[in-house]
């Protein structure tokens, strides 16, 4: 009788441990628009890679859950979160008061702002020096808005491109005098393509932006897991290693 009871108790305990482990390892569906290197993009094998991807993988490992990344177009990414098709969205999403009304955000995981990229030999040292110069920007971005504020919305000196790398390539070939773009994209491009040829200018007039990981409004349990993992990877140096891998400093 005692042996049977012991066996039953052991089996129940093992089952309880298995269930607890299974709950801790729950897999969440993650929406990301894989068209914004170095944060998220697809490699030659069509795998989703990038800074955001590595950060969330590390957060998941510390937070006790798993993630599955799904390439999700930007125009529908927040709807997929709200209707339950995605549990998490990480896609270089700036935390704004408007977005906080319809979704919840983790603590910030990335500080972003605009940077000016110029050739090393350029005499440009601040935003004001760009008056009368040709500025390359990616269409419809914050960099585009900054150039419009400086030169005027219809200025012929604003040269628009489909992507930031194309704008920087035009800078390298001498077609524009400077590029205004997101700091993460600019730093990554220079680290991989423009070392010793380009430099950046951090103008005080550019406001800081903060990226956050989004979850459905009211999902406090998941948000707590994410914030727990984020705090852990910042504390143990994992975040810094990932940051250095993608941004070089």
Name these PLM-found stretches:
Residues 18-24:
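Sec/Tat signal peptide C-region and signal peptidase I cleavage site
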Residues 25-92, 236:
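Extracytoplasmic small-molecule ligand-binding "clamshell" domains
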Residues 53-62, 128, 134, 141, ...:
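Extended ligand-binding regions for polar small-molecule ligands
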Residues 91-101, 146-149, 172, 177-207:
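A ligand-binding cleft/hinge motif common to bilobed small-molecule-binding domains
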Residues 42, 56-65, 143-161, 190-195, ...:
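Ligand-binding cleft/hinge of the Venus flytrap
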Residues 1-9:
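Bacterial N-terminal signal peptides that target proteins for export
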Residues 118-135:
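Flexible hinge/capping segments at coil-to-helix
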Residues 34, 111-118, 187, 191-227, ...:
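Periplasmic-binding protein-like
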């Amino acid at each position: 009788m005692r042996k049977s009871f012991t066996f039953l108790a052991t089996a129940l305990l093992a089952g309880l441990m298995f269930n607890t482990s299974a709950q801790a390892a729950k897999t969440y569906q993650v929406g990301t628009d894989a068209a914004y290197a170095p944060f998220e993009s697809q490699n030659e094998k069509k795998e989703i890679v990038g800074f955001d991807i590595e950060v969330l993988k590390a957060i998941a490992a510390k937070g006790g859950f798993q993630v599955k990344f799904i390439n999700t177009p930007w125009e529908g990414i927040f709807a997929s979160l709200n209707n339950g098709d995605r549990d998490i969205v990480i896609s270089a999403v700036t935390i704004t008061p408007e977005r906080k009304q319809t979704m919840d955000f983790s603590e910030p995981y990335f500080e972003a702002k605009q940077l000016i990229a110029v050739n090393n030999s350029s005499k440009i040292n601040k935003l004001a020096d760009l008056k009368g110069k040709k500025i390359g920007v990616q269409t419809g971005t914050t960099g585009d808005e900054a150039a419009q504020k400086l030169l005027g919305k219809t200025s012929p000196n604003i040269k628009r491109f489909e992507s930031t790398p194309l704008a920087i390539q035009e800078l390298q070939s001498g077609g524009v005098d400077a590029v205004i773009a997101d700091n993460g994209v600019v730093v990554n491009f220079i680290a991989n393509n423009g070392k010793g040829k380009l430099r950046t200018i951090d103008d005080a007039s550019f406001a800081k932006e903060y990226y956050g990981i989004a979850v459905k409004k009211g999902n406090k349990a998941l948000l707590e897991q994410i914030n727990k993992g984020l705090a852990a990877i910042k504390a143990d140096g994992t975040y810094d290693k990932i940051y250095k891998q993608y941004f070089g400093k």
